[in-house]
């Protein structure tokens, strides 16, 4: 459980500290005061990434030299300092130089309005989801993914520089290396999706009218991947890129057997993604034997009272949960309330 959050120059929060004393934390305030920034800081401290922007320096307050996040979680101090030139990660004040050694020390599951892109967005956004979640629990996956990206970059560079290439020896060597790593990533993604579908079934025993399923859509089968790499060299040379592989995978979220992208309303889409995140939470617990922290940004908006109550009833008491909202919280639940105004703590009780 996170017991302390301390931020410096992070977004619009210049000097912010709050102590946490309950598993359920409700962060209230008007739009623009920094509610989402608190959740982003926790996500950043856990994953070294922002869920909002691919430009890391955007997290540094304007005209400041750095931003920092300090979290105390189960007596362990997590700290990440971001400058325009890079970032520095420490655990209990000892520097962790390899990001692969840092990721997974603190595990989080995040829901934000942007996550509707898991249904409506591009395949690259869905692949990013697969990678981020698997990286948190599997060092092997992270290592394989980094290797795959490195080999893919080499192969694509070779394809671009040698448009008249006729000797495919080195191209085939890179193809075999890509295949060896790629099929391991394929297997982990497939197992991950199968595991989430099992979690969906468990959740659906309580809510039988809400059927969600995840369908893996690999770009190419394991059996055909190596064959493609060894027989489609001319095609890859023409397009100057590797045209098949796990870097082009996708998945669909199905609602009552239909593609949610085409069949689900905005409100239903939010619930589908929420269901996905709750399943993910339970999967992480099963695999790692630890409880991930659930971060919910503006999760209650666009949900009617019945759906709000349905959602709140599903929150496990075993996980720490942070929720941002501009709405009053209904129901008899025990929580810590933090009210933000102009980036400062007005009330935390």
Curated annotation (Swiss-Prot):
User: What InterPro entries does the annotation carry?
Assistant: DNA-binding_RecF, DNA-binding_RecF_CS, P-loop_NTPase, RecF/RecN/SMC_N, RecF_2
Report keywords, A-Z. Answer: ATP-binding, Cytoplasm, DNA damage, DNA repair, DNA replication, DNA-binding, Nucleotide-binding, SOS response
- The residues listed in the UniProt record as binding ATP, with positions renumbered to this chain, are 29-36
Alphabetized NCBIfam families for the sequence: recf
Location relative to the cell: Cytoplasm
Query: Matching PROSITE patterns, A to Z?
Result: RECF_1, RECF_2
Instruction: List the disulfide bonds in this chain.
Output: none
Q: Does the entry feature the keyword DNA repair, yes or no? A: yes
GO MF annotations in UniProt: ATP binding; single-stranded DNA binding
Q: What is this protein called?
A: DNA replication and repair protein RecF
Matches recorded under Gene3D superfamilies: P-loop containing nucleotide triphosphate hydrolases, RecF/RecN/SMC, N-terminal domain
- Per its database record, what is this protein's job? The RecF protein is involved in DNA metabolism; it is required for DNA replication and normal SOS inducibility. RecF binds preferentially to single-stranded, linear DNA. It also seems to bind ATP.
Q: Which organism is it from?
A: Acholeplasma laidlawii (strain PG-8A)
Q: Does the keyword ATP-binding apply?
A: yes
């Amino acid at each position: 459980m996170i017991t302390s959050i301390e931020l410096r120059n992070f977004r619009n929060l210049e000097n912010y500290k709050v102590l946490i004393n309950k598993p359920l934390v409700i962060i209230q305030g008007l739009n623009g005061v920094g509610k989402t920034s608190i959740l982003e800081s926790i996500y950043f401290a856990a994953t070294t990434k922002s869920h909002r922007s691919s430009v890391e320096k955007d997290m540094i307050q304007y005209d400041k030299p750095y931003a920092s996040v300090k979290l105390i979680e189960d007596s362990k101090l997590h700290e990440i300092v971001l400058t325009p030139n890079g970032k520095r990660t420490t655990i209990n004040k000892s520097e962790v130089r390899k990001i692969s050694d840092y990721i997974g020390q603190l595990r989080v599951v995040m829901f934000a309005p942007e996550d509707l892109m898991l249904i409506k967005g591009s395949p690259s956004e869905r692949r990013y989801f697969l990678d981020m979640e698997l990286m948190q629990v599997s060092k092997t996956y992270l290592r394989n993914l980094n290797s795959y990206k490195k080999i893919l970059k080499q192969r694509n560079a070779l394809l671009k520089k040698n448009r008249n290439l006729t000797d495919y020896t080195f191209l085939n060597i890179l193809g075999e290396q890509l295949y060896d790593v790629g099929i391991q990533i394929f297997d982990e993604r497939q197992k991950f999706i199968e595991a989430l579908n099992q979690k969906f079934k468990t959740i659906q025993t309580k809510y039988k009218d809400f059927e969600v399923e995840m369908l893996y859509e690999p770009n190419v089968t394991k059996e055909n991947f190596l064959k493609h790499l060894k027989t489609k060299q001319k095609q890859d040379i023409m397009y100057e890129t590797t045209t098949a592989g796990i870097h082009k995978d996708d998945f669909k979220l199905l609602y009552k057997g239909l593609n949610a992208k085409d069949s689900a309303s905005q409100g239903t889409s939010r619930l589908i993604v929420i269901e996905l995140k709750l399943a993910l939470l339970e999967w992480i617990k099963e695999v790692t034997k630890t409880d991930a922290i659930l971060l919910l940004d503006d999760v209650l908006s666009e949900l009617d009272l019945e759906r709000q109550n349905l959602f709140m009833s599903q929150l496990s008491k075993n996980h720490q949960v942070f929720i941002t909202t501009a709405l009053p919280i209904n129901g008899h639940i025990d929580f810590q309330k933090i009210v933000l105004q102009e980036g400062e703590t007005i009330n935390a009780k």
